[in-house]
């Protein structure tokens, strides 16, 4: 069955949920360890995803060990590199670089591993949205960009791509989208358990720290990846990686509305171009 508008809409909705991540971290306790933040997000998210799987009772084949391993490693590394990038170079630049690099990286990895060939519309839409992200990034300026933070964000993009390709391969092999998500995130959470001992986790026992961890585990993880998995089950992984570029547009708007960052004409133009690219791709 070919993908329907609701599959595209589900992935775009997931991208909107992803876009709340950086703002939630910025509103959390200052100096919170990115190791612990990432580990807490995965642990809470995995528990919620397990509940979703049990609630929906979706069947399917068991995940292959290779998909579980590569997906879990990818999602674990993403948490560490993304939250470190946001702390190093800020919400906007960290988010834009991480998710902005993902479509090209995902398309390349998917072709090398699964021989999945992206469509012409994907190439065009990815170029359109990339132009939008360039405007968004340029609008923030580069005077305060941390080179290490940018490298961490690129690492997050590569880690996300590894997770996405592994998840798609698992579902193509017969695993249900709910089982794929909860098992990969569960394995990733296990990998990050040592972070609670290595990093300072006392902030989790404060009001703002607890709410931040709960939000990160519930909205941009459990809710987002349930929607993402539902859409990815029918959509090419490269297409999905471009549709989630709703994330940087959302992050930019939230940075203005919630964090008080001022948007100039370049910001609005960038958001508009990204939205146009997403609409174009969703009509595939």
Write out the residue ranges for each language-model feature.
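Hydrophobic transmembrane alpha-helices of multi-pass small-molecule transport proteins
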Residues: 49, 75, 118-138, 157, ...
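Helix-helix packing/entry segments at the starts of transmembrane helices
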Residues: 40, 94-101, 167-189, 221-257
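Hydrophobic alpha-helical transmembrane segments of multi-pass integral membrane proteins
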Residues: 5-10, 36-51, 124-131, 148-155, ...
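Hydrophobic/aromatic residues within transmembrane alpha-helices
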Residues: 28, 37, 41, 85, ...
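Specific alpha-helical transmembrane segments that line the substrate/conduction pathway
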Residues: 36-47, 83-116, 156, 237-256
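Glycine-/small-residue-enriched transmembrane alpha-helix faces in small-molecule transporters
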Residues: 1-39, 73, 77-81, 142-169
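Specific transmembrane alpha-helical segments of multi-pass solute transporters/efflux pumps
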Residues: 21-22, 56-94, 98, 107, ...
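C-terminal-most transmembrane helix of multi-pass membrane proteins
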Residues: 2-4, 40-43, 50-51, 209-211, ...
């Amino acid at each position: 069955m070919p993908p329907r508008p609701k599959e595209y809409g589900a992935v775009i909705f997931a991208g909107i949920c992803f876009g709340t991540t950086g703002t939630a971290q910025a509103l959390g306790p200052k100096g919170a360890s990115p190791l612990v933040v990432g580990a807490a997000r995965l642990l809470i998210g995995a528990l919620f995803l397990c509940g979703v799987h049990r609630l929906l009772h979706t069947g399917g084949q068991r995940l292959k060990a290779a998909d579980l391993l590569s997906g879990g490693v990818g999602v674990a590394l993403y948490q560490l590199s993304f939250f470190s990038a946001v702390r190093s170079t800020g919400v906007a630049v960290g988010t834009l670089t991480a998710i902005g690099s993902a479509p090209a990286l995902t398309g390349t990895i998917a072709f090398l591993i699964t021989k999945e060939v992206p469509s012409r519309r994907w190439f065009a839409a990815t170029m359109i949205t990339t132009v939008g992200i360039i405007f968004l990034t340029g609008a923030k300026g580069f005077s305060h960009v941390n080179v290490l933070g940018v490298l961490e964000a690129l690492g997050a993009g590569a880690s996300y791509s590894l997770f996405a390709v592994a998840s798609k391969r698992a579902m193509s092999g017969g695993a249900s989208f709910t089982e794929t998500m909860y098992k990969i995130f569960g394995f990733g959470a296990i990998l990050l358990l040592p972070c609670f001992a290595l990093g300072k986790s006392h902030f989790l026992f404060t009001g703002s720290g607890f709410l931040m961890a709960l939000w990160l585990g519930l909205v941009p993880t459990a809710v987002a990846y349930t929607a993402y998995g539902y859409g990815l089950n029918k959509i090419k992984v490269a297409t999905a990686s471009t549709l989630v570029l709703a994330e940087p547009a959302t992050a930019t708007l939230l940075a203005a509305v919630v964090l008080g960052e001022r948007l100039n004409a370049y910001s609005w133009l960038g958001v508009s171009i990204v939205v146009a690219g997403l609409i174009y791709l969703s009509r595939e």
